[in-house]
Design a protein with these regions (language model features):
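Positively charged n-region of N-terminal signal peptides that target proteins for export
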Residues: 1-5
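Bacterial N-terminal signal peptides
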Residues: 7-16
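Acidic, metal/ion-coordinating pockets
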Residues: 20-310
Length: 310
């Protein structure tokens, strides 16, 4: 724990320094592309009464200014969006109301990672509804498709001559959920399948930067597992420029593998868990520059009243 605290302290100082050094660069280089990533977003259980009483805007009120400054904002959506109950037999089953989806877009969210262990909570029909409601609201779903091949296709963001491909996958089993190669589903590949997809894309589009948003690791563990470290090394070697992790519900360290940045876990963001470590989260803003360099800044948040605060 002491080592982890030191890492976080250094990360905070690094975040401040990066924020200072990249702001002038971004102003001078209008073609830089910035993508902001958040931790886990839940819109049910303890968050639901707050959303109903005060609205979605309240949940993101303090972080919305950061959303507005980025070219894209990617959340990890840990809940299906559907008005029809069709629960899967799981320990924890969530559902968000479709009427809230437009408000997510209004606060500045542009992309939602669907490849996690909770968007499946209301079955295939819930997944399909989630995809539909996100699209109708103008939010791009990630990690979803009608076949494994489609699920493994990235979403590409473009600004000027900058292009960034975002892959989204979950690399762990899901309780009472069977992944089929054909039919609507989330991206749940093997490590080999994901690595090969990154390798193939990198070889086919060498000028496009690659970000992999992963649901992985062990819940409530402050250090990445051996499996996380091994997969991160494989993905970095295969061409991933950055890896963004979710699922542990706590912050995990930042690492650099060659030229690749690895953010093992961003922790929670909009969530209702109570242990102190689950009340901390982090936003990561990746900046892709025209000289092919990548910089980042981190913004730490404290979760109070189930919403991120500064």
């Amino acid at each position: 724990m002491r080592w982890f605290s030191i890492v976080l302290a250094v990360s905070c100082l690094t975040s401040f320094l990066f924020a200072c050094s990249t702001s002038s660069s971004d102003d001078a280089n209008e073609e830089s592309l910035s993508i902001l990533f958040t931790g886990d977003v839940l819109l049910d259980r303890g968050v639901r009464p707050i959303a109903e009483a005060r609205g979605i805007g309240y949940l993101f009120e303090q972080v919305e200014p950061f959303f507005r400054k980025a070219d894209a904002v990617v959340i990890n959506l840990e809940v299906p969006i559907t008005d029809t109950l069709s629960p899967v037999n799981k320990k924890f089953v969530f559902r968000a109301d479709s009427r809230w989806t437009p408000a997510l877009r209004q606060v500045g969210i542009t992309h939602a990672a669907m490849a996690n262990n909770h968007t499946v909570d209301q079955g295939v029909s819930g997944l399909q509804a989630t995809y539909r409601h996100l699209k109708e609201a103008g939010i791009t779903p990630l990690g979803y498709g009608i076949s494994t091949a489609r699920q493994l296709k990235p979403n590409v963001l473009t600004k000027g001559n900058q292009r960034v491909a975002i892959f989204n996958a979950i690399t762990m089993p899901i309780e009472n959920w069977h992944h089929a190669d054909e039919g609507p589903g989330i991206c749940q590949p093997s490590a080999d399948q994901l690595t090969e997809a990154i390798q193939h894309y990198h070889a086919s589009w060498p000028g496009v930067r690659i970000v992999v948003v992963l649901h992985w690791g062990v819940e409530f563990q402050a250090q990445p597992s051996i499996g996380q470290r091994m997969l991160a090394a494989r993905l970095a070697e295969s061409g991933a420029d950055a890896i963004i992790g979710h699922h542990p519900h706590v912050l995990q360290p930042i690492d650099t593998l060659g030229q690749s940045f690895v953010f093992y876990s961003l922790g929670n963001f909009v969530f209702d868990q109570h242990p102190p470590m689950t009340r901390e989260g982090m936003m990561v803003n990746l900046h892709f520059h025209s000289d092919a360099s990548i910089t980042y800044d981190t913004i730490r948040v404290q979760i109070k009243n189930n919403r991120p605060t500064l």
